[in-house]
Amino acid sequence: MVAILCGIRGGDNKNGESKLAGKSAFNSDFNFNLYEYFHFCSKMLKKEDTKPLSRGRSSNSPCMIVFCAFEQLSTLINAAKKHGFVNYIPLVFVKNYSPQVLKANMRIVGATEYALVLYRDRLPKFRNGCIQDENGKNIRGTGHMIFNWFNWEKDAKDIPKIHPAQKPVAVIKKLIEIFTDEGDVVIDPCCGSGSTLRAAAELGRSAFGFEIDRNFYNRAKNEMLVFEKDKQLSIFDFYKNA
């Protein structure tokens, strides 16, 4: 599951802040219930993998990835624990630019994004290229170390810009490749632009998204999700044939 909590862009008033600073970015900002959100997500995730594990192997357990502001990390960690996500791995995404242009001569500017990998008891499924032999043992020389920081790769021009807090398809693809296998299911409960659904589909994963804003939903459907698709049954086909 890839979950996205949206932030606010910055850098265009006299204080070097966004003109939206202190204002609601989205209609749901002031009535977003974090605990209901985690309750919903905990129900959507599959159960823990209970099979015995070999030494040095990850389980097939699920995880939840939440993008957030640095200041929100502790709040999310505490809320997640109350819904069974007792473990976490912090992720940092490094940009080679900053939107805080007017702050450049005032202070150090922000050029990072943050996320949390939340999971229950067992470490989640982890794919780093490691190959096992016929006895289930890791083959030396396969697999590579994955750091907890990533480059923030901008999308090409063929990816439409729909949502103010849209995450690049290239970045989401990296996370999906690490924590899922082809054929697995990816769910985005705050779908926004639909970039998560596109990334999942291009990697051969099934994907479902939820979005309460009709404008973002329509734009995602008509602009983001118009690439070459396979023959996967859509929910609209399901109801049409029911």
Question: Language-model segments: what does each one mean?
Answer:
Residues 101, 224-225:
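Amphipathic alpha-helical interaction segments
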Residues 220-221:
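Conserved SAM-binding loop
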Residues 71, 225-242:
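Class I S-adenosyl-L-methionine-dependent methyltransferase module
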Residues 1-210, 215-217:
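Core catalytic lobe of class I
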